[in-house]
From Swiss-Prot:
The lineage of its organism: Bacteria, Pseudomonadati, Pseudomonadota, Gammaproteobacteria, Pasteurellales. One of its GO terms (molecular function) is rRNA binding. This is Large ribosomal subunit protein uL24. CDD domains: KOW_RPL26. SMART domains: KOW. InterPro entries: KOW (IPR005824), Rib_uL2_dom2 (IPR014722), Ribosomal_uL24 (IPR003256), Ribosomal_uL24_CS (IPR005825), Ribosomal_uL24_KOW (IPR041988), Translation_prot_SH3-like_sf (IPR008991).
């Protein structure tokens, strides 16, 4: 099955502490989670690893967010939108459901 949200798509967060924020998808996991640039930032406590020359401390990093909690952003309407699939010239393409424009 084709993915409705793919890497480098601009998305908007629908629920949670970052609701309403926009960002670019950096990674899509096969279990239905996505990493969005600058969204869902967590603080990890990391131990130092002297063998690798890595210092320990508090590290801020992006955590995965469920794909159902984000929607693709339509730049024409400036709103979140749904994605549909159709065949054009023998190829499967994604399109915005609000205005039928190909993504």
């Amino acid at each position: 099955m084709a993915a409705k949200i793919r890497q480098n798509d601009e998305v908007i967060v629908l629920t949670g502490k970052d609701k309403g924020k926009r960002g670019k998808v950096t990674k899509v996991l096969p279990n239905g989670k996505v990493f969005v640039e600058g969204i869902n930032i967590i603080t990890k406590h990391e131990k130092p690893v002297p063998a690798l020359g890595k210092a320990g401390g508090l590290v801020k990093k992006e955590a995965a967010i469920d794909a159902s909690n984000v929607a693709i952003f339509n730049p024409k309407t400036n709103k979140a939108d749904r994605v549909g699939f159709r065949f054009e010239d023998g190829k499967k393409v994604r399109f915005f459901k609000s205005n039928n424009e190909i993504i």
